[in-house]
């Protein structure tokens, strides 16, 4: 609305200016004043009317805008109510569908388990029925063969009867042996399953199973001299740790220092935690997690109080958890591993990490062995140095002797060349003449030897 006011104001100013200019041209000032007053009054009246008109228009527009705004707010409220109702209905339907889906899944799972149980029972019944039928057929077959044997006894000779009897009894024994073998395998399988169940449910058996597992790992990683089973780490106490790694003392003849490794398996607390996680009950999961932490801390405190006795042992011990799941859950608990190391001086290890720990100890053993053998190597090098000095003296003597022999050979060579120079003027004999002459010299030498012997 402001541009309209500006335009009207400009027009009024222009009209006033034109009227003033027109009146200035007149010579009568009184008439000019009268005209100016009249024009000014008329202009003010027109301006007032225009302002009132604009005010009325503005009020009409504001009223229309207020009505439009009220309608818009009402429509928005209505749409919001509809949207809220629609979202609530969708959420209710979603919850209902999720509940129905979970119920269907639970029903399907229960039905599946029921079918599986019925199928297993049916399979067992079928196996029992088949076995009974085979035994019945076997009995009938045996009875039939016995009847045939009785009939043949009357018809055949004793030798034929014996042959048939041997054959029949052999067949019967083989089949009975097969049946007995099958029953024995089934009984052995059932016994093995029962033993495994007792091992996994009985606390002492679980400990024995963990000890066997740790024993296998130690046997594959270290030598028999580097660890021991059932070690009494403190001579003044009766506590015996499951396993201990033998660390060498500071001196060569000092007693070894033991690194205790004890097997712990709080399986019940861990299984209760797994059941709570499967039920998706956060409060129960938290409670079972706290119980598992408490059980681990109790075992760590027991290890600290029983097996950590410096200087007979190291100032820490190793708690071996025989399953990777239990070890991972223990490490996953916030701050539990730090508390065990700081307060109880216990390091938690699983089947994989204990292997890495033992490998690092094995490298330490090798380094220590190299350090211990370095003095022996140094002594051996000293002995080699002494012998090498003697060998150097022998080489010097040999060199002198070789030089002496070389000088003798050189002197002989010079004398030989001197004799050759002096004999250059002597005529050489043929090979036959030389041989005859040498033979004659040999005969003369032999005769002279005989004469000398005779004279004696």
UniProtKB/Swiss-Prot annotation:
Protein name, as recorded: DNA recombination protein RmuC homolog
Chain segments annotated as coiled-coil in the UniProt record: 36-60, 106-158
Pfam families in the record: RmuC
GO BP, one annotated term: DNA recombination
Function description: Involved in DNA recombination.
Family classification: Belongs to the RmuC family.
Biological source species: Xylella fastidiosa (strain 9a5c)
Entry keyword annotation includes Acetylation: no
Gene: rmuC
Top-level taxon of origin: Bacteria
InterPro entries: DNA_recombination_RmuC
Keywords per UniProt: Coiled coil, DNA recombination
């Amino acid at each position: 609305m402001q541009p309209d006011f500006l335009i009207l104001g400009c027009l009024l100013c222009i009209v006033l200016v034109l009227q003033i200019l027109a009146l200035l041209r007149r010579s009568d000032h009184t008439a000019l004043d009268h005209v100016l007053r009249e024009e000014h009054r008329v202009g003010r009246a027109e301006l007032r009317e225009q302002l009132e008109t604009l005010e009325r228009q503005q009020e009409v527009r504001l009223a229309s805008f207020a009505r439009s705004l009220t309608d818009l707010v009402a429509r928005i409220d209505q749409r919001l109510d509809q949207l809220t109702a629609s979202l609530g209905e969708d959420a209710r339907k979603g919850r209902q569908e999720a509940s129905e889906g979970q119920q269907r899944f639970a029903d399907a799972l229960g039905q599946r388990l029921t079918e599986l149980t019925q199928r297993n029972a049916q399979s067992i019944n079928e196996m029992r029925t088949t076995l009974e039928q085979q035994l019945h057929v076997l009995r009938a077959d045996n009875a039939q063969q016995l009847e045939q044997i009785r009939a043949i006894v009357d018809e055949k000779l004793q030798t034929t009867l014996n042959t048939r009897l041997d054959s029949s009894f052999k067949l019967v024994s083989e089949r009975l042996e097969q049946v007995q073998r099958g029953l024995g395998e089934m009984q052995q399988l059932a016994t093995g399953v029962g033993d495994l169940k007792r091992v996994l449910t009985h606390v002492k058996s679980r400990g024995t199973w963990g000890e066997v597992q740790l024993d296998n790992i130690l046997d594959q990683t270290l030598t028999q001299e580097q660890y021991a089973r059932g070690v009494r780490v403190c001579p003044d106490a009766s506590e015996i740790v499951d396993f201990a790694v033998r660390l060498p003392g500071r001196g060569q003849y000092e007693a070894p220092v033991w690194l205790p490794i004890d097997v712990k398996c709080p399986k019940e607390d861990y299984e209760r935690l797994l059941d709570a996680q499967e039920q998706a009950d956060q409060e129960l999961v938290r409670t079972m997690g706290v119980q598992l932490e408490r059980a681990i801390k109790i075992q760590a405190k027991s290890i600290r109080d029983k097996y950590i006795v410096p200087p007979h042992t190291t100032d820490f011990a190793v708690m071996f958890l025989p399953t990777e799941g239990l070890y991972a859950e223990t490490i996953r608990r916030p701050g539990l591993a730090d508390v065990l190391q700081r307060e109880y001086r216990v390091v938690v290890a699983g089947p994989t990490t204990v292997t890495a720990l033992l490998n690092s100890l094995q490298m330490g053993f090798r380094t220590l062995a190299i350090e211990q053998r370095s003095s022996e190597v140094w002594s051996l090098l000293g002995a080699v140095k002494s012998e090498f000095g003697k060998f150097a003296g022998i080489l010097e003597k040999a060199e002198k002797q070789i030089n002496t022999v070389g000088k003798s050979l050189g002197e002989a060579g010079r004398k030989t060349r001197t004799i050759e120079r002096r004999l250059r003027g002597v005529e050489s004999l043929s090979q036959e003449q030389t041989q005859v002459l040498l033979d004659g010299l040999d005969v003369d030498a032999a005769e002279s030897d005989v004469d000398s012997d005779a004279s004696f």
